[in-house]
Amino acid sequence: MSRRKPASGGLAASSSAPARQAVLSRFFQSTGSLKSTSSSTGAADQVDPGAAAAAAAAAAAAPPAPPAPAFPPQLPPHIATEIDRRKKRPLENDGPVKKKVKKVQQKEGGSDLGMSGNSEPKKCLRTRNVSKSLEKLKEFCCDSALPQSRVQTESLQERFAVLPKCTDFDDISLLHAKNAVSSEDSKRQINQKDTTLFDLSQFGSSNTSHENLQKTASKSANKRSKSIYTPLELQYIEMKQQHKDAVLCVECGYKYRFFGEDAEIAARELNIYCHLDHNFMTASIPTHRLFVHVRRLVAKGYKVGVVKQTETAALKAIGDNRSSLFSRKLTALYTKSTLIGEDVNPLIKLDDAVNVDEIMTDTSTSYLLCISENKENVRDKKKGNIFIGIVGVQPATGEVVFDSFQDSASRSELETRMSSLQPVELLLPSALSEQTEALIHRATSVSVQDDRIRVERMDNIYFEYSHAFQAVTEFYAKDTVDIKGSQIISGIVNLEKPVICSLAAIIKYLKEFNLEKMLSKPENFKQLSSKMEFMTINGTTLRNLEILQNQTDMKTKGSLLWVLDHTKTSFGRRKLKKWVTQPLLKLREINARLDAVSEVLHSESSVFGQIENHLRKLPDIERGLCSIYHKKCSTQEFFLIVKTLYHLKSEFQAIIPAVNSHIQSDLLRTVILEIPELLSPVEHYLKILNEQAAKVGDKTELFKDLSDFPLIKKRKDEIQGVIDEIRMHLQEIRKILKNPSAQYVTVSGQEFMIEIKNSAVSCIPTDWVKVGSTKAVSRFHSPFIVENYRHLNQLREQLVLDCSAEWLDFLEKFSEHYHSLCKAVHHLATVDCIFSLAKVAKQGDYCRPTVQEERKIVIKNGRHPVIDVLLGEQDQYVPNNTDLSEDSERVMIITGPNMGGKSSYIKQVALITIMAQIGSYVPAEEATIGIVDGIFTRMGAADNIYKGQSTFMEELTDTAEIIRKATSQSLVILDELGRGTSTHDGIAIAYATLEYFIRDVKSLTLFVTHYPPVCELEKNYSHQVGNYHMGFLVSEDESKLDPGAAEQVPDFVTFLYQITRGIAARSYGLNVAKLADVPGEILKKAAHKSKELEGLINTKRKRLKYFAKLWTMHNAQDLQKWTEEFNMEETQTSLLH
C-alpha cells in the first residue's frame, strides 16, 4: 500500500501532511495494542527529510502553540474500572471472530520486511481495524445509524463515544482515538453547518486554513456521493424504518445478526459480544439459539422482530437478481402477550441445555388489555368520573373478554379488572385521564423488571369512535355472507362506544402480528364482570385476602390459589384461577360442582384414577391449538398436539361404559362423555402425516398420500425425472472412462461426483469440472451433471416452498375444527379442577358446605385455609365459630389485644365463603353459607405515594367505595377503620360508618376496632349487633402493681386466639412492644403512663355515671345516699393517685 499523497491546495497543507502523518503514526504507536508487525520504527522515521524540513520551517513561522497535553491521557479510575469490567465480559459467539483473526494473520504471513519503495509496511489486524474504524467514524454521522433525537445535537466526538462499547480492539485505544478526534470535531462545528466528514490527514493539523478545510470537505462530500453502506446495511435500514420500535434479528446464513442500537441492546441484555463492522455495531447469535434469546428480550419488555431470508441460493441463481443481495422480510413480531410461533415454541425447542426458569416467566396468563375512555361528559371528567371500556385478549389461548363501566376518580373498577386479568401488556391511547395514567404508572412500577407490564401506545385517532366504528365494521363485514354474519355485526355495533374503540385499536395492533383472526368470532367474546353470574371481588379484596398472591413477596405461595391448586395441566391451572376470582352466584351451578367433588372424593371406581393418569401426561394443548389456529406452529408441535388429542379420544372412548355405570354427577358425566365426540376430527389429520418427517420438521416428506396435494406430487415427479436422467448418464460416463464399475459418490452433501485416482486424472475430459480432491483422489462433474444437478437443486428448493404453502393450507383446514377442539380442552380443564378440589378436601377436617339462598354464614370450628396449611400438623390452627344471619346477629364488633388473631379470623370467614361458592369443601366441621353477591374489605394502614394519598385518605377512599357498592347480600369487612387520624375523629367516623351499615345497608358485617365507644352500638341495635373479642389471659405475677412505685411493670398477655362474646376493655399494646424487644426502661415508663391515663379516664366515667343518677332522684333520702357514695368514691380515688 502506497503512502498517502499530500493534500493539494496550498503550501501549508502540503507541508503539514508529513507532520500530520507523523502525529498519527505516533498516536497508533502510543496505544499498547497497536504495534506494527514489521518493526518498532514508526511512520515518523520514514518521513522524507525534505518534507520534514519544510514542515519545520512552517511550524517556526507559525505562532507558538499551547503546550500539548500528556499523551496518551491518564484514564480516570471509574473509566479504567469500566474497561476492566468490559474486558471480562463472557463471550457467547466469538468463534467466528477468532476464525477471522486467524485467517487474516495467516494471509499476512507474519513478516513485512520485504517491502520496498514507498509502500507502507503492513500493520497488524488491530492496527488496520482501528484505522478502518477511524475512517468509518467520519462516515458514521449518517442519521439512520443513530437515534433520531441525537442526530442534530451530538458532536462527532459524542457520536464516537457511542460506538466502542465492545469492538475488535481494546477500549484504551478507543479512548485515545476519541481524544484525537476532539480537536477536529470542534473545527467541524465552527466551519460547517451540515454533517461534513473529514479526511484522516486533518487529525494532527492545528493551523489548517479555512479555505483548505472547505476544499477538503467538498472533496469528501463528492466521495460520499457513492453509497457508504453495504447492501446488507441498506436492507437493514429500510426494514428498521418500517419497524422503529422493534429489535430486529436478521437472518444471515447460519446466524441471526443485530445492527446498530439493536446490537447494543442485545449485548447488554443477552450478555453477548458486539463489535463495530462497517457502519454499525453488530452482534450475532446462532440460529438454533433464536428461541432462547428472543424469549429473553421479550421478557425484558422489548418488541422483537425476526427477519428471515426469503430466497435460496439455487433459485436466486436462475433469477434476474442473481448478483444482488438475498431478499429478506420480517416474518414474525413478538411481545410479552404475542409470544406465539414456531421460532419461540417452548413445547418443542426446549432441551437439556436450556434453563427453563431463565427464559420463561409465569405463563399462566398473558393478557393484552386495551383501555379506552369516553370523554364526552366534561363535568364528570373534571370530577374524575369517567366511562371506561376494555377489551382483553389472550392470543396464546384465544380467549377474548370485554367490559364497560362507570368509574370514579379512584379508578377502583379499572383496578379490579386489571387485578383479575393480570395483563402482561397494555395497549393505550397516547393520552388518558390523569387518574387513569396514575393507576397505569402504579401498576407498571410495582413489579420487578422481567415481570413488569409492557405498555404500548397508539395515536388517539385510532380510539376515536367514528374511526373505530368504521374499522370494526370493515373487519367483520368481509366475512358477512349470510344472516348469521349480519347478526354478528349487529351485536358488535351495539357494544358500548369505549368497547368499540378498544376493539378497533386491538384489531389494528394484532394485525401487525398476524393474530387478528382470533377476533373474527365475536360469539366467543365473554363479558368480564357479570353481576348475575359471579361474585364481586374487587382488586382491594383480592389483595387484602391474598387470594392470588401473598402480600409479603407477591408470590403465589401463601395465597388461597396456592392451597387449592393441585391441577395436573397448564390449562387446568388457568381455569382454576378463573374459578377462584369468579365465585358463582347460581345455587344450581355451585351444587353441581360440589356434587362432582364429593363423588371424586368418595368414589371407589378406578375410572377416576385412569382419567387422572391421562391428565398428568398432557402438554399445554390449549396453547398448542391456538398456535395451530394462527398457523404459527411447527410440524413437530402439530404432530405432538394432534397425536395427544387422538390418544385422549381413544382413552376416553374406552372408559365410556364405566362412566355410564359408575359416575352419578351430572357435571362429570356431561364433560367426560362429550370429549370423544369433540375430538373425533383429529384422526383424519393424523393419518395423513408421516410421523418421522413431522418429528424432524421435513415438510417435503410430511404427507403420506399425495392425492390431495397435486402440486407436491407434480414437483416430486419432476425431481425424480431429473434424478433418473442423471443415473442414466452414468452409463455414458463409464464408456468415457472405460470403467464399467464407476459409481457416483456423495461427499459432504455434494452428490453425483465421479471419483478418480490422482494417478489417472489424465484420462478425464477437459470440459469436466473438478469439484474436490484429496491426496489420493479427485472428484469431478461432467457438463451434463453440472447442468442437471443445478436444475435438480432448483426443483428441490421449489419443492420446499410448495410444501410450505401446502402446509399452511393444511393448517387452515384443520382450524375449521378449532372451536370444537377447544371445547374439549375446556372440558378436560374442568375435570382437572374438580380433581384438584377433591384433593384439597382429602387433606382432613374439611367438610362439604351447605349453600343456600338465605342470608347467613354459620361456621362451626372453622380454620383459616392458608394458615392451617402453613402451620402443618404440629402447630394446629385454633378453630373458631361464626354465626351471622338475617334473623339474628348480622354484625360482629370484634375487639381484643393486638396480635390476638382478629384479622386472621375475619379473613378466615371471607375465604371460607369464597371457597364454598367456588364449589369447594371448606376447612370446618360444619358450614352453612348463604350466597353473597360480593365481598368488600377495608384492611391495613398504609399511605399510597403513587396516588398522593395519606393513610387516612386511603382508608376513607376504600370505605366510600364499599358504601357505594355494598348491598344487603354482601359481606363487608372493616378492620380498624379510623386509626389513621386523631382518636376523636377516628371514633366518630368508625361509629357513624358502622351505624350506616347496620341501619341502611343491612349487610353481613365484621367490624374490628380498638375504640370502646363503638361497642355501644350493641345497646342501640341489640338484635342485629353482637360484641366479641379474641380471648386472652393476663399473667397475675407480672401484672401486680405496686401502688407506691414510680414505675409499673407492663402486663404479660397470653393469646388464646378464641372468639369470645363480650368487650375487651384494653388492647394490651405494651405486650406487643415487649415482644418487639422495646427497651425495658421505655416499657416501664409507658406502663406507668398508661395506668395513669387509664385512671383519669375511669374517674371521669364514674363521675359522669354518678351525675347521671342525680337527675333521677326525687326525695332527700336518695340525695343523701348519693352524696355519701360519691364522697366515698372521691376519697378512694384521691388515695390511689
Curated annotation (Swiss-Prot):
Transmembrane segments: none annotated. The modification Phosphothreonine is found at T1099. This is DNA mismatch repair protein Msh3. One of its GO terms (cellular component) is nucleus. Belongs to the DNA mismatch repair MutS family. MSH3 subfamily. Component of the post-replicative DNA mismatch repair system (MMR). Heterodimerizes with MSH2 to form MutS beta which binds to DNA mismatches thereby initiating DNA repair. When bound, the MutS beta heterodimer bends the DNA helix and shields approximately 20 base pairs. MutS beta recognizes large insertion-deletion loops (IDL) up to 13 nucleotides long. After mismatch binding, forms a ternary complex with the MutL alpha heterodimer, which is thought to be responsible for directing the downstream MMR events, including strand discrimination, excision, and resynthesis. Gene3D superfamilies: 1.10.1420.10, DNA repair protein MutS, domain I, MutS, connector domain, P-loop containing nucleotide triphosphate hydrolases. The modification Phosphoserine is found at S33. ATP binds at G896, P897, N898, M899, G900, G901, K902, S903. SUPFAM superfamilies: DNA repair protein MutS, domain I, DNA repair protein MutS, domain II, DNA repair protein MutS, domain III, P-loop containing nucleoside triphosphate hydrolases. It is linked to Endometrial cancer: A malignancy of endometrium, the mucous lining of the uterus. Most endometrial cancers are adenocarcinomas, cancers that begin in cells that make and release mucus and other fluids. Keywords: ATP-binding, DNA damage, DNA repair, DNA-binding, Nucleotide-binding, Phosphoprotein. The gene is MSH3. It comes from Homo sapiens. One of its GO terms (biological process) is negative regulation of DNA recombination. Residues 81-97 have a biased composition (Basic and acidic residues). PANTHER family: DNA MISMATCH REPAIR PROTEIN MSH3, DNA MISMATCH REPAIR PROTEIN MUTS FAMILY MEMBER. PROSITE patterns: DNA_MISMATCH_REPAIR_2 (PS00486). The lineage of its organism: Eukaryota, Metazoa, Chordata, Craniata, Vertebrata.
